[in-house]
């Protein structure tokens, strides 16, 4: 996901045009950030996913090379552009809201995972998030579990976690995601207990 970030004192009301403070474009997306962070921490990191054949896609490929992240499994589409995230950040308190437009990310389905299964099977840890199609995520998680690969799930953007039970070793939601997934507000201990039951995992 290419992050398009608008910084503003507050969010606009419906129908309102609001003057912002600044704007930035940055390489982002949870998968990209995790792959880069893992590489910088010393892991042999590989990225699976889809990009457009546009300028944003070129920027990502250059970044993978610069960071030493294996990008040989990335497929590129001429029909669908690179996914983007429209982010609004309140400069008063840092609170943010995000709209994602997946575009080529939606090509990361079960068939894509099948074509790139070798990378998952040969890994120690598989990091997943919900910016990709459910079919692709579940196929990847099942393949990982069948081959004793640890599965770490970031459940964002929040979606119903149907079919995930027994496939996740570690789930890492933020407070808002935990509340939305469990229906429990404010009590992180109860949220963690609910998520372990929901997913059948031991680590939150």
Residue ranges with predicted function:
Residues 1-50, 55-69:
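Glycine-rich phosphate/adenosyl-contacting loop at the front of the ribokinase-like
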Residues 22, 48-53, 71-82, 154-156, ...:
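Beta-strand->loop->alpha-helix junctions that form or flank phosphate-binding loops
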Residues 72, 76-77, 87-125:
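Conserved phosphate-binding/catalytic loop of the ribokinase/pfkB sugar-kinase fold
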Residues 138-204:
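Conserved phosphate/ATP/ADP-binding segment of small-molecule kinases
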Residues 36, 84-88, 97, 204:
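Short beta-strand scaffold segments in enzyme catalytic cores
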